Structures are given as C-alpha cells and as structure tokens.
Amino acid sequence: DIVLVDEINRAPAKTQAALFEVMEERQISIDGITHKMGELYTILATQNPVEQEGTYKLPEAQLDRFLMKITMDYPSLEEEVDILERHHTNTSLIRLDDIKPAITKEELLSLRAFMNQVFVDRTLLQYIALIVQQTRTSKAVYLGASPRASVAMLQASKAYALLQGRDFVTPEDIKFVAPYVLQHRLILTAEAEM
C-alpha cells in the first residue's frame, strides 16, 4: 500500500500524469480494467533540485496533491562519518529479515480512525483558513495556496497532535506543520526569491 517514487521530477510527463491520477482518484485503469487502491494507499516521493540536469519542474496542480514537503539537508559531520564507517566495515547493507514492522495495518487503521476524532476548535479552523488566505494576498507571493492546502494543514495538525499524545489540536500544532504543508504550494515573486 506504500509506493516510493524516487526522483519524481525525472519521470516523463506521461508517467507523472498517471501517478497523479491514481493519487487523486485512488484507482488506476490498465488495459481497460480499473484497479482500486487499498485504504492505506500512500505515495512518498523524492525529488532532485530543479536546477539539476534532466529534471523537470512539477506543475503546481500536481505538487498540490502532496500533503507535505520535507526538505532533507546534507548530513552533519558526525552523521557523515557514521556513513563512512558503515561502508568501511561493510555494515551499510540492511537485511530485509532484520527489519521488523513498526506498526500493523490494523493499528494504523485504528490510529487513522482515532485521528478523525481529534478535536479542532472552530477558532483553529478559522486560523488555518486565515493562514492559507494570507498566502493569496501577500505581495511576496505570486501564486498562493489552494483550499487543498487548508485541508492538508488540518489533517497534518490532527496527526501531529495525535503524535504528541493529545486528542485536540493547538495553535502550536498548526504553526509546526504549516511550513511543511505550504512550502511546495507557494510560488514567490521574483523579488521575494532574491
């Protein structure tokens, strides 16, 4: 139920279009036969910097379908030394037999159902809407976030609250998830990018 798409912005447009169709409709047609995706169907994607050769900028409508964007930085000195040690001692390979599930499918479905019960005060719904609306009126933003961003921020805030051991959302939850939810949905003006 989990699909990892590596280097999504290197895929041809036709492949990207098929991927985004299944993301939106949760089904795909192959040779005239429609296949429904499972209820936990999730797509994770990696992306190379756009300035690299052979990459294509993803259209805004397609980027908008991803819940969040998390940017990975280079490893710290200590982390890079650890990588070198693993390669030097040949312990960098992970055996599939050694991997243990962190959670069962049933537990994940239960958490998802519980997430739907996480309380969000109406003032916080207004707060989310206000944040997203501000992206549409800011002089620094050429293209603001769509209503899909509001829904994503709500869902991410509820999930984050649950991960913090709470059954209610706080303004801090929203502030925490906002950059991850918004960064790939906004197009800044040329002046703002400088």
Model regions and ranges:
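Canonical AAA+ ATPase core
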Residues: E7-T15, M23-V118, K158-L163
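C-terminal engagement/docking regions of AAA+ P-loop ATPases
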Residues: T135-M194
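Conserved catalytic core of Hanks-type protein kinase domains
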Residues: V22, H87, I131, M153, ...
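Hydrophobic positions in the central parallel beta-sheet of the AAA+
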Residues: V3-L4
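Alpha-helical structural signal
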Residues: Q16, L40, L63-D64, E80, ...
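Conserved AAA+ ATPase small/helical "lid" subdomain
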Residues: L96-S150
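Conserved C-terminal helix/linker of AAA+ ATPases
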Residues: T46, D98-T104, L125-Q126, G165-V181
